[in-house]
Amino acid sequence: MPQHGRHAPRRGSMGFWPRKRASRIYPRIKTWPKIEEIKPLAFAAYKVGMTHTILNINGERVFTPVTVLEAPELLVIGAKAYKKENGALKEISSLYFNDLPQYVFRKIPKLKNYNFEEKKEQFLSKADNADEVKIIVSTQPWKIKLKKTPEIFDIPIGGSDVNKKLEYALSLLGKELSINDVFKEGQYVDVIAVTKGKGFQGVIKRFHVHRRQHKSEKGVRKVGAIGSRGPGRIFPTVPMPGQMGYHRRTEYNKLIIKIGEPLNVEGGWVRYGQVIGPTILLKGSVPGPRKRLIILREAIRPPRKQEKVEGIEYISLSPKN
């Protein structure tokens, strides 16, 4: 307890525990909203940078920082059928399309000799008993000259009729999904990404612990005490040095300001280059550095009072440092 008589809450939130590195550079999503419309529940885009705009919100001119995302089309490369067992979904069958770009084989080499027609019959026979259907999508970073190896992940389909969802998933095989097929302007989405990695950091930067006085014993940038149980048994709430950043994080209810043509600043975006594909403007900030994949999900708990953007008066295209 502090001895100065003022309120001093403990440092760091146990809501973000354990503070360890994410298992991969793009996130896995386990929680999805339920909607009636039959459509994919998520999309993916690459973070470009930030700029500022002047928006007309509820009749007022509002200076608003926005994040720019580049969203090339997603390629639907397969479908998966799931069965509920003991309260969890278990995969019972999967199907992949046969005519795919060569870059997809970097991620899944076994698809080079995949017999689509034979696997399709097996998939349909097992999918009749499915409780859930998801599509398997691949990003296409080569279309925006970002890199060659794609990210591959599953996206659930909205709706309650499994047969209709299965039919919809099969109709998408081998086709491309655009951002306009999933989201629209003025809609709220959740953004899920892996944050910037900071490496191994001390308690001052990691937990914002105050520096000790200059005459303190055995160090200044350290915690004063680690508990009464001794160094052999330390509570998990005690600030300790360790990994900072590169964590999977979710931010709720980001407003889509605009979906449109490529948006470039003078001289190109710093540490990114020129935007080639469709652009998304999101109100506020987004986790992760430039070029990182951001998953946009249907808002799982949208706000009751929703802002209405009546127009965009100005978008800053000045060089960004």
From Swiss-Prot:
GO molecular function, one term: structural constituent of ribosome
Pfam families: Ribosomal_L3
Gene Ontology cellular component annotations, sorted alphabetically: cytosolic large ribosomal subunit
Keywords: Ribonucleoprotein, Ribosomal protein, RNA-binding, rRNA-binding
Coiled coil, from the record: none
Gene Ontology biological-process entries: translation
PROSITE patterns for the chain: RIBOSOMAL_L3
Record InterPro entries: L3_arc_euk, Ribosomal_L3_dom_3_arc_sf, Ribosomal_uL3, Ribosomal_uL3_arc, Ribosomal_uL3_CS, Transl_B-barrel_sf
Its job: One of the primary rRNA binding proteins, it binds directly near the 3'-end of the 23S rRNA, where it nucleates assembly of the 50S subunit.
Cited NCBIfam families: L3_arch, PRK04231.1
Binding partners and assembly: Part of the 50S ribosomal subunit. Forms a cluster with proteins L14 and L24e.
HAMAP family, per the entry: Ribosomal_uL3_A (MF_01325_A)
Family per similarity comment: Belongs to the universal ribosomal protein uL3 family.
Name under which the protein is recorded: Large ribosomal subunit protein uL3
Species of the source: Nanoarchaeum equitans (strain Kin4-M)
